Regions:
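Catalytic alpha/beta active-site cores
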Residues: 1-209, 214-215, 233, 240-246, ...
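Short, hydrophobic/aliphatic alpha-helical segments
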Residues: 8-9, 260-271, 309, 329
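Short glycine/threonine-rich loop-to-helix capping motif typified by GTGT followed
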Residues: 30, 167-176, 210-221, 249-263, ...
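Residue-level signal for the start and early helices of compact helical domains
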Residues: 103-105, 148, 236-238, 266, ...
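Extended, hydrophobic alpha-helical segments in both membrane/secreted and soluble proteins
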Residues: 182, 205-207, 215-230, 245-250, ...
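Catalytic or ion-coupling anion/metal-binding cores of large enzyme and transporter domains
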Residues: 193-200, 227-240, 307, 318-329
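Active-site or pore-adjacent capping/gating segments
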Residues: 268, 279-329
Length: 329
C-alpha cells in the first residue's frame, strides 16, 4: 500500500481515494489508514530534523532481516513520500504521544470512499465473497471506527446504483433500489446503536447516467427523497440530509461497433450529470466496450470533462436546465 500511494500526500485536500473493493474492505482500509498516518509521521520527522536518527532506528530494526524496497525509478514528480518507512510502522520511530497526535490529525483529514456496498452485490453483480449478514457487520464495524475516531471526510460506503443499472435496470428502478439500499443501511446502523447524525454524513451514493430522459433529474429526485426521509422519518440534522453522489457515464450504452462515436454518447451523459449537479463525475473511455482503455482513449475521456468545465458557457451557470437565471433571461 505504501508503494502504491508513494508520492501522493493522502492528507492533502486535493487527494481523494476511491477504494473500489467489495471483499475484505476493513483489511484494505486498515492498510490505507496506516499508510496515510505513516506518511505524516515521515513528514513530521523531516520537518523537525529527526529523519536521520529515525533512519538509523529503522536500519537497526531490519538488522539481519530482508528489508522491503521500491524497485525501479520513481516517476517524474514523485518525491517518494511514504517509502521511507517501508516495512515498519510510524509508532516504531516516534514516541507514543507524537504518534497518537499525528494519527488523530490524519484520520480527521484523510479523504476518500470505501465502495463496499454488499446489497448491490447481491442484487446486480453476484460476486459476493462473504454472506450478506457478515458483510453488513463489516460495513458497520468500519462506520463505528469512523465515529469513534472522528473520520469525517471519508465515506464509509458508496451506495451504488451504477451496477444495478449495468445489470439492466432503467433509471427509475436504479434509483428505487439504490435508495432502498441506503435506507436499509441506515436502519441497520441505527439498530447497532449509532446516532443518525454520527454516520449519515459518511454515506455517499453512486449512479449511472445513460441516455434516458429521466437521467436529467435522477440526482435532484434522489436528494429530495433522501432529505425529506432524513428530516421527517429520522429527525436528522441538515448535514445528514445532504445526499452526495458520484456519476459514471453508462458503460452499458457504449457500442462495440464504430467505437469512436462513443465519445458523443459519453459527452451527452456527462452533460446530464453536470447539469443535475452531481458531486463528482467519471467519463468512460470510448473503447471500454471492447478492451481496457488506452492512453489515447483515457485522454479523450478526461478532455470531455475539461472542455465542458472550462469552455461550455452554459456550465458556468449552476442548475441551467431547471429554472436558472440564465434560461429565464
Amino acid at each position: 500500500m505504501k508503494k502504491l500511494y508513494s508520492g501522493f500526500d493522502l492528507c492533502a485536500p486535493t487527494t481523494s481515494v476511491s477504494m473500489t473493493i467489495n471483499g475484505p474492505a476493513p483489511m484494505i482500509l486498515a492498510f490505507f489508514m496506516n499508510t496515510a498516518i505513516d506518511q505524516q509521521v515521515e513528514k513530521h520527522l523531516r520537518a523537525t530534523g529527526e529523519w536521520e536518527s529515525a533512519k538509523r532506528r529503522v536500519d537497526k530494526y531490519f538488522e539481519g532481516r530482508e528489508r522491503p524496497c521500491y524497485e525501479g525509478e520513481l516517476p517524474p514528480g514523485n518525491d517518494g513520500l511514504g517509502l521511507g518507512l517501508l516495512g515498519v510502522s510510524g509508532d516504531k520511530v516516534v514516541d507514543a504521544e507524537t504518534y497518537e497526535r499525528i494519527k488523530t490529525e490524519t484520520l480527521a483529514s484523510v479523504r476518500g470512499t470505501v465502495q463496499a456496498d454488499i446489497l448491490k452485490e447481491d442484487q446486480a453483480q453476484n460476486t459476493c465473497i462473504f454472506s450478506t449478514e457478515f458483510a453488513m457487520k463489516m460495513m458497520g464495524d468500519v462506520q463505528q471506527y469512523f465515529i469513534d475516531n472522528n473520520v469525517r471526510n471519508y465515506y464509509s460506503v458508496s451506495i451504488s446504483g451504477y451496477h444495478i443499472a449495468e445489470a439492466g435496470a432503467n433509471p427509475i428502478s436504479q434509483l428505487a433500489f439504490t435508495l432502498a439500499n441506503g435506507f436499509t443501511i441506515v436502519e441497520y446502523y441505527l439498530a447497532r446503536g449509532m446516532d443518525i447524525d454520527s454516520f449519515a454524513p459518511n454515506l455517499s451514493f453512486f449512479f449511472s447516467n445513460g441516455m434516458d430522459p429521466e437521467y436529467t433529474v435522477i440526482g435532484r429526485v434522489a436528494r429530495r427523497i433522501w432529505a425529506r426521509a432524513m428530516r421527517e422519518r429520522y429527525g436528522a440534522g441538515s448535514r445528514s440530509q445532504m445526499l452526495k453522489y458520484h456519476v459514471q457515464t453508462s458503460g452499458r450504452s457504449l457500442h462495440a461497433q464504430e467505437i469512436s462515436f462513443n465519445d458523443i454518447r459519453t459527452t451527452l451523459q456527462a452533460l446530464y450529470a453536470l447539469f443535475d449537479n452531481c458531486n463528482s463525475l467519471h467519463t468512460n473511455a470510448f473503447d471500454e466496450a471492447i478492451t481496457t482503455p488506452t492512453e489515447q482513449s483515457v485522454r479523450r475521456a478526461v478532455a470531455i470533462q475539461m472542455i465542458i468545465s472550462r469552455e461550455l458557457g452554459l456550465n458556468f451557470c449552476e442548475n441551467p436546465w431547471q429554472g436558472s437565471f440564465v434560461i429565464d433571461e
